[in-house]
């Protein structure tokens, strides 16, 4: 059945307008981008097939344009548009920080960490330093590790916070495996970091774990 024959409330575009993009599935978002599907399939089914065969979403979107253009349902034009859309998203988030916008929205902060860290093949631990109005001072990748982990030194985060005269920090790291579940080591270093920052009156606002799907927020889960 063509999407135009679906009930209005089930169509991806109408759902986006009524409830926001965040409520759509990966396949529905990709279907909106595709616009139309392969012969005999609607855009949603084509998107589902792409994700099933070449996904999950992170792996699909991390592909270079040369790889994307060879996938069924994409081609040269869509591959270039998709790559450009991802870069625009990254620049939009970066521009907001560079303008000194206050960061009070955890979704935007998590999205920024995801854009910066998700494509790394090894684990990277980064820190976003904020002033007393929660405006960005600096985003720094402080610790680089292997595919299995990165060694984090709270004293180095404290040193940089003092140097930058930061009032608060948001930290985040990626899991190259794609598994977003925080490990026991993640929870332990978060507590050590919070304790160290408390000593210099710098607030740890959040810790994001980046994997497949939406970032996991320690603050949102009450783990801080």
Swiss-Prot record:
The keyword Transmembrane helix belongs to this UniProt entry's keyword annotation: no
Chain sites annotated for binding Zn(2+): 173, 175, 186
Protein name: UPF0758 protein XF_0148
Gene3D superfamilies membership: Cytidine Deaminase, domain 2
GO biological process, one term: proteolysis
PANTHER family to which the protein is assigned, alphabetical: DNA REPAIR PROTEIN RADC (PTHR30471), UPF0758 PROTEIN YEES-RELATED (PTHR30471:SF3)
Gene Ontology MF term list: metal ion binding; metallopeptidase activity
UniProt similarity note: Belongs to the UPF0758 family.
A Pfam family reported for this protein in Swiss-Prot or TrEMBL: UPF0758_N
Source organism per UniProt: Xylella fastidiosa (strain 9a5c)
Motif annotated as JAMM motif, chain positions: 173-186
CDD domains linked to this entry: MPN_DUF2466 (cd08071)
Domain MPN, first and last residues per copy: 102-224
Keywords: Hydrolase, Metal-binding, Metalloprotease, Protease, Zinc
Top-level taxon in the UniProt lineage: Bacteria
InterPro entries listed in its UniProt record: MPN, RadC_JAB, RuvA_2-like, UPF0758, UPF0758_CS, UPF0758_N
